[in-house]
Amino acid sequence: MSDSQAKRTLPRMLISLLITLAIGAVWFYVSLPAINLHNTGFYSFVFILLLVYILVFMIILGVDTGHQEIHLKDYLSFAKNQCKIVVLIVVVMAAIFVVGQLISAPIFRAGSYHELLDVGTGDFATEIEPVSFDEIPMLDEASASVLGDRKLGELSDMVSQFDVSADYTQINYQGRPVRVAALEYGDFFKWFLNTKEGLPAYITVDMVTQEADVVRLSDLGLEGMRYSPSEYFNRDLNRFLRFHYHTYMFSSAHLEIDEAGQPWWVCPRETRTIGLFGGADIIGAVLLNASTGEHAYYDVKDIPTWVDRVYTASLIVQQYDYYGTY
């Protein structure tokens, strides 16, 4: 490349880079990929951004393809000649992705998948305490949802503004088996009208008595829930987590309440223990105060005792299937 060509190309290269970074920032804000080589979504994010850069650079440079439309061969030819470093990055990341898939495959790592779940021998008589009949849960999640919706419908000041989340978490609250669910904003306009104070309550359903209750946070001397999945912009739960924990991969967050009735989002942190992408397991959790946004990360062994669920049932079943299959 001659000096004159370099002087003409460099500013346009920088402009292309700035445009790509702007597009990437917006896309990151929306898609929220974990910046982690164990996360397959991170590879997609990087690949597409690199391809966007090549396309933007090609358009700004004013490449003459000889026809109105840009064909695939034009794109590939331009990338090969003008974007060698970008192409090299794509090739390297593609190689990492493919190798990562291979070294994570059960066909090559069957023993590792078998050992993922530590299975020991226990004594049922000494380890399982008897439960009285009035402590046995009698209600599944679907039934709890019906009771919760019905209870919210009785409250004229809330039913027109809020819905009940479909996610009812089973917990032990003050010695009772309870399902708890957050409220959600009915739509964007109802969010706009209520977001300053936050969600004013949550739903609890006693799994033994089948009694549903709307717990108003103001009655407990607590602030409304300002951080939740139904929030928009920076107080959206997943976005808040991503901006504070850029590299963490999270399992599905769920609502729990401590013994004082304060709602917390329990956000289990996932890792991959086999190769790059295999052997999902939980190594800790972020606890986020739904009212104040206060948050902290805990390793599994340090998680407060009032937290009832860190491992999901689906993950345990998956690991048990690996144990039996391999």
Short names for language-model regions:
Residues 2-326:
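Soluble extracytoplasmic regions of secretory-pathway and membrane proteins
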